[in-house]
């Protein structure tokens, strides 16, 4: 980056973000900043506070970083950050977004660099925000054709197909079997032994990435958690989202145990839940964006049930039942 790179890295690792910004901005004029410095400034601002002012300033950094070095990897990183952050800008009222410019930048970079997974993920998020479902599907289809067979890509694709009517249930089932084939199994020696709970109370675990304000899953689940018989059941609630809010805190008070597993890798999450010896685990995510289907493929409870959150199969052998009514099936 420049002679200050070592100091930049040290301050960033020590989370001295304000000092880092001061050092970068003091060292040269804005127009003389390198692409790497623009990228670092943009990221650092957001780590200090992700408010409207910092989002707009970071967008300016990322855009300038891309324009400064379009044909370098750090320039490409700036563009990925620029597109991803633009998605967040949609949440802020009274902000203008130049859609045409963003799409032109994307196409320009794709023409030069060819296929790049993270660039495709960024534009996929952008198309989702525009409600351009067909374009989302086109991006995901290109990723799958480039051998991106990770569960996130595959589940995103099958989820997107639920928004149009060109797939039959047979098509969904066929693709869900493909997901099943591509979802990895951990070695048995890596996993905590799966044990049945010896207590009289049944241990029920609910896994969701949607226990947040105004999400429909919370309205369905709250009634259950308010009314279950505490003499017969012990409830575990596992969150799979980044930040808790008031709704999350309210739900914690309704259950015996709660834990956020969003930052746990798949193996650690599986072993954490297995160690609790729950009897029945409910998947409230399915193929939605917050999914953790690999946990259920590797089995976290003797009985596993797909319930609210995603109203279809994702073809996993690990899911024993779908809890539904005649209107859903």
Model-predicted segments: where are they?
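Alpha-helical solenoid repeat scaffolds of the TPR/TPR-like class and their adjacent stem/linker regions
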Residues: 1-329
